[in-house]
């Protein structure tokens, strides 16, 4: 069971992108995206 590299949440933020839910259950694993 891989751990989510970002945070587990219901909705991703503006500068986040959803990834495979790993161990988030019903939640989405959101990883921050680097912005310039």
UniProtKB/Swiss-Prot annotation:
Reported tissue expression: Detected in egg white (at protein level).
Task: Respond yes or no to whether keyword 4Fe-4S is given for this record.
Answer: no
Disulfide bond positions: 4-30, 8-29, 12-24
Q: Name one GO biological process term.
A: defense response to bacterium
- Provide this UniProt record's keywords sorted from A to Z: Antibiotic, Antimicrobial, Defensin, Disulfide bond, Pyrrolidone carboxylic acid, Secreted
Give the subcellular location: Secreted
> Where is this protein primarily located?
secreted
Q: Which domain of life is it from?
A: Eukaryota
Has keyword Ubl conjugation? no
**Record PTM Pyrrolidone carboxylic acid, positions in chain:** 1
Q: Which GO terms describe its cellular component?
A: extracellular region
What biological function has been recorded for the protein in this entry?
Antibacterial and antiviral peptide. Has strong inhibitory activity towards E.coli and S.typhimurium. Has significant antiviral activity against Chandipura virus.
Q: Which family does it belong to?
A: Belongs to the beta-defensin family.
Q: How does it assemble?
A: Monomer.
- Report what the protein is called: Defensin-like turtle egg white protein TEWP
